Swiss-Prot record:
List of residues binding Zn(2+): H311, H315, D326
Pfam families, per the entry: Peptidase_M35
Name of this protein: Probable neutral protease 2 homolog TRV_06370
GO molecular function: metal ion binding; metalloendopeptidase activity
Keyword Metal-binding: yes
């Protein structure tokens, strides 16, 4: 993936695949236009439509440098399989390189190959679009103070399947191998020093928090409305069921349907990434920064090992179907999601569990 700056800056938004009602002070301040530049190549042009400089966070956005979910791809009305990564980023101690200052009426371009993160081997017509929420900071600052929204044009492309299949997959093709602890599906050969013990503790805490969250979902309608924007019986049942599924997957006595690695062997642990999931493979990988988090964080909505593990497990279709996306990070962004998006947002589950 490559960036071509129209300005001397790069940056971006947060969370793909969310169409979110905007508050008056959070109306759309950027325009995103998609264009096809090759068989499976996309150029996204991002323009600041406002009259003030925007400082945009790049994490999990259409301008993320990493093989994350930048667009939604459909064929014959069905979603094309995503083969890239769904990371959880560290949201504290953000540094300037994670942002872009985009001046009034200025634009940047970002190009990427859909075939590197989607299975386009079938070929034929596809429909591509992007929409989401972008965390923002004040100019030359790194503290998130708000967000803006975007929705791109809808782009139709005719893809040559053989040519697309020849594109190297960003996260590798063959499955990783190693010695697996069948009790939890942890690849023990990927662990060094105390990492196995740390991960086992995180899974145990994830199971405990998930069970408590399932109970809270059923007994605390005010908290359901706070995080999931509704307390109707269908949503309560779905949320509780998903938490119980995460609890089962987290339990050391489970055979497990995901494969969990103590360390990265696919090159996904970029700066700022705590852990990431490959939903196409039901695999989770911890990054070095994961081990710098506390096991549990007593600060409400603070990131820790337990809720990071919980967050990543919701990204796995073997645990939650359809698997959760990264539609909004942090309490303020989660609070801005409507009910239809909150229930599909991974951080909504981790924050709810942390807040109980």
């Amino acid at each position: 993936m490559q960036f071509t700056a129209l300005l001397a800056a790069l940056g971006a938004p947060l969370a793909l695949a969310a169409s979110i009602p905007a508050a008056a002070h959070n109306h759309s301040m950027i325009d995103v236009q998609l264009a096809a530049t090759g068989n499976s190549m996309i150029k996204a042009t991002i323009t600041n439509t406002g009259d003030r400089t925007l400082n945009l966070l790049k994490f999990n956005t259409i301008m993320d440098e990493h093989p994350t979910r930048k667009v939604m791809v459909y064929q014959d009305g069905a979603e094309v399989q995503f083969t890239g990564m769904l990371p959880r980023y560290k949201m504290s101690d953000l540094t300037p390189e994670y942002f872009v200052n985009l001046g009034p009426k200025a634009s940047v371009e970002h190009s990427f190959d859909l075939a590197a993160t989607h299975d386009l081997s079938r070929g034929g017509k596809i429909v591509v679009k992007a929409h989401g929420m972008v965390p923002t900071a004040e100019e030359n600052a790194t503290t998130i103070t708000g967000h803006t929204l975007y929705e791109s044009n809808e782009l139709t492309m005719d893809v040559d399947g053989k040519q697309a299949a020849a594109v190297e997959q960003a996260m590798g093709g063959d499955d990783s191998t190693g010695v697996i602890d069948k009790r939890s599906n942890i690849v023990t050969s990927s662990c060094r020093g105390s990492q196995l013990r740390v991960l086992q503790t995180a899974l145990s805490n994830s199971a405990r928090l998930s069970r408590a969250a399932a109970s809270a979902a059923q007994r605390n309608p005010s908290k359901m409305r706070e995080y999931f924007k509704t307390a109707d019986s269908r949503t309560v049942q779905k949320v509780a069921s998903r938490f119980l599924s995460v609890a089962r997957e987290s339990s050391s006595g489970s055979t497990g349907r995901t494969t969990y690695y103590c360390n990265d062997n696919r090159g996904g642990c970029h700066p700022g990434v705590l852990a990431y999931t490959l939903p196409s493979k039901n695999q989770v990988f911890n990054c070095p920064s994961y081990y710098q988090l506390p096991a549990l964080n007593n600060r409400c909505h603070g990131q820790d090992q337990a809720t990071t593990t919980l967050h990543e497990l919701t990204h796995n279709p073997a645990v939650v179907t359809p698997f959760c996306e990264d539609l909004g990070y942090g309490y303020q962004r989660v609070s801005a999601l409507p009910a239809s998006k909150a229930i599909q947002n991974a951080d909504t589950y981790s924050l709810f569990a942390n807040g109980m």
